[in-house]
């Protein structure tokens, strides 16, 4: 494994959540609430990604279920190619715009050049999986974290 560029040091503040792409929030929700005892926040539509999002949490664990809300949602394409499963890892950052600039300076390819509104008042941006060993990553500025 290669050593990350020094520009990345200190950008993230830990894992924010793991996102899982699902065909149906209702079906997946039952598994996480019943079998795992997780609690859910209200479902929210995220226009920039054309998805419905259900955040589930338990202690320090946080999972985000993402369901496509339109045929042209990036998650629709993901599900068609890969089926349900882990969609992305999300990293908590203090300032999404500064994190984007630092990652660009370090040579990483970003999908988003500026923060976009995420669920529950967050600002988000995605890092292209070609820059991260095949893993889609999200930067999350969360005023509630």
Predicted regions and their residues:
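Conserved active-site tyrosine of GNAT-family acetyltransferases
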Residues: 28-33, 103
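N-terminal beta-strand motif that seeds the catalytic metal site of vicinal oxygen chelate
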Residues: 1-29, 84-93, 142-145
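Conserved short beta-strand elements that form part of the metal-binding/catalytic scaffold
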Residues: 39-80, 120-144
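Conserved acetyl-CoA-binding loop of GNAT-fold acetyltransferases
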Residues: 34-40, 107-110
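Mid-chain, well-packed structural core segment of small domains
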Residues: 78, 82-106
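Vicinal oxygen chelate
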Residues: 2-11, 54-55, 91, 100-145
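Residues within well-ordered alpha-helices
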Residues: 28-29, 52, 99
């Amino acid at each position: 494994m290669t050593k990350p560029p020094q520009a990345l040091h200190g950008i993230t503040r830990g894992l924010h959540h793991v996102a899982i792409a699902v065909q149906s929030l209702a079906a997946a929700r039952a598994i996480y609430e019943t079998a795992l005892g997780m609690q859910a926040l209200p479902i929210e539509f995220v226009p920039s990604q054309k998805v419905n999002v259900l955040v589930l949490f338990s202690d320090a664990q946080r999972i985000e279920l993402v369901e496509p809300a339109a045929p042209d949602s990036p998650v629709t394409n993901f599900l068609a190619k890969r089926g349900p499963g882990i969609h992305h890892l999300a990293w908590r950052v203090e300032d999404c715009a500064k994190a984007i600039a630092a990652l660009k300076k370090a040579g990483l390819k970003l999908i988003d050049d500026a923060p976009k509104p995420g669920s529950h008042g967050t600002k988000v941006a995605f890092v292209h999986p070609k820059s991260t060993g095949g893993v889609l990553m999200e930067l999350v500025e969360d005023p509630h974290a």
